[in-house]
From Swiss-Prot:
GO terms for molecular function: translation elongation factor activity. Signal peptide: none annotated. Residues 80-83 are annotated as: Involved in Mg(2+) ion dislocation from EF-Tu. CDD domains: UBA_EF-Ts. The gene is tsf. Its main location: cytoplasm. This is Elongation factor Ts. It is found in: Cytoplasm. It comes from Clavibacter sepedonicus. Keywords: Cytoplasm, Elongation factor, Protein biosynthesis. It comes from the Bacteria. GO terms for cellular component: cytoplasm. Gene3D superfamilies: 1.10.286.20, DNA helicase RuvA subunit, C-terminal domain (1.10.8.10), Elongation factor Ts, dimerisation domain (3.30.479.20). Belongs to the EF-Ts family. It holds the Pfam family EF_TS.
Length: 275
C-alpha cells in the first residue's frame, strides 16, 4: 500500500513541474518522503541534462519586463519549437524573468545565480529541462535603466511566443515615438546606437573593403575618396541606429525622427531567438 497521498503527488508536481507518473514513481522509491523524492527526480534530471549538453538550442522565446525604472530583456533557448510554445516552458520563462528582475541582474552569470524561490535560476532551469526533456539555456540578459524605457516584443509566427525583443532607453516624453523606434529596431536590426559607437577597427576593415572594391571597378583615383566615403555612409546606415532610414518613412533618418519628437535615445538591446 502506498504511503503517500494524492496531495503529496500534487505537491511534488507543483514544486518541480514533474509529470504524474514520474512524481508517483519518485514517491514510491522515496517511501513517501517528498524531499527525498525531489532529490531523486533532480538526480535523474541531471543525468538526462548531461546527455543533452552538446545539443543545439536554436529555438525558444524572448521576454521582457519594466519595473522600478529599469527594463530587463531575456532570451530563453530550447531545442525545438514544440517546447518553445509549451505552457511549462512559457511559465518557466516568466519565473526566470521575475527572478532576474528582482535580483537586478544584467548578465547571464548574475542571472543564473539569482534566487528563484528555494533554488537559483540555474537550478530552476535544470529542473525544468529534465521535465521537458530538452536542453534549456538562458542565452542572453540585458538590463537598461535610463530615464524611460520602451519594450517591444514581436511574434514571427502566431503559433509561437515572441521571437524578437527590443528594449529602448530614452529621455523625453513622446512614448509613442519611442515605441515606434523600438519597432524599427526589431525590423532593421542595428548593431550600434550612433556611428561614433562603431569600433574603429571595424570601420577601418570596412574602409579597406570598399577601397579595394572601388579600385577594382576602375574608378578614377581622384574620385576614390568621395566614393569611399559614400560607401562608408551606406555601411553606417546598416549598423548604426541613428543613421538608418526610418522604417515608417524612409525619407527621414531615425536621428531626425527622434530629434523632431524631442527624444534622446541613450541605449537599446535587441534579441532574436537563435541569432
Amino acid at each position: 500500500m502506498a504511503n503517500f497521498t494524492a496531495a503529496d503527488v500534487k505537491e511534488l508536481r507543483d514544486r518541480l513541474g514533474a509529470g504524474m507518473m514520474d512524481s508517483k514513481n519518485a514517491l514510491v522509491e522515496a517511501d513517501g518522503d517528498i524531499e527525498k523524492a525531489i532529490e531523486i527526480l533532480r538526480l535523474k534530471g541531471q543525468k538526462g541534462n548531461a546527455k543533452r549538453g552538446d545539443r543545439s538550442t536554436a529555438e525558444g522565446l524572448v521576454a521582457a519586463s519594466e519595473q522600478d525604472g529599469a527594463a530587463t530583456l531575456i532570451e530563453l533557448a530550447c531545442e525545438t519549437d514544440f517546447v518553445a510554445k509549451n505552457d511549462k516552458f512559457i511559465a518557466l520563462s516568466e519565473s526566470v524573468l521575475a527572478a532576474v528582475v528582482a535580483a537586478g541582474a544584467s548578465t547571464v552569470e548574475e542571472a543564473l545565480q539569482a534566487p528563484a524561490g528555494e533554488q537559483t535560476v540555474d537550478q530552476l532551469i535544470s529542473d525544468r529541462a529534465a521535465i521537458l526533456g530538452e536542453k534549456i539555456a538562458l542565452r542572453r540578459v540585458a538590463r537598461l535603466a535610463g530615464e524611460h524605457q520602451e519594450i517591444y516584443l514581436h511574434r514571427t509566427s502566431k503559433d509561437l511566443p515572441p521571437q524578437v525583443g527590443v528594449v529602448v532607453d530614452y529621455s523625453g516624453t513622446d512614448a509613442e515615438t519611442a515605441r515606434s523606434i523600438a519597432q524599427h529596431i526589431a525590423f532593421a536590426n542595428p548593431e550600434y546606437l550612433a556611428r561614433e559607437d562603431v569600433p574603429a577597427d571595424k570601420v577601418e576593415a570596412e574602409r579597406a573593403i570598399v577601397t579595394e572594391i572601388s579600385r577594382n571597378e576602375g574608378k578614377p583615383e581622384a574620385a576614390l575618396p568621395k566614393i569611399i566615403e559614400g560607401r562608408l555612409t551606406g555601411f553606417f546606415k546598416q549598423v548604426a541606429l541613428l543613421e538608418q532610414d526610418y522604417a515608417k518613412d524612409n525619407k527621414q533618418s531615425v536621428k531626425k525622427v527622434v530629434e523632431a519628437a524631442g527624444l534622446t535615445v541613450t541605449g537599446f538591446a535587441r534579441f532574436k531567438v537563435g541569432a
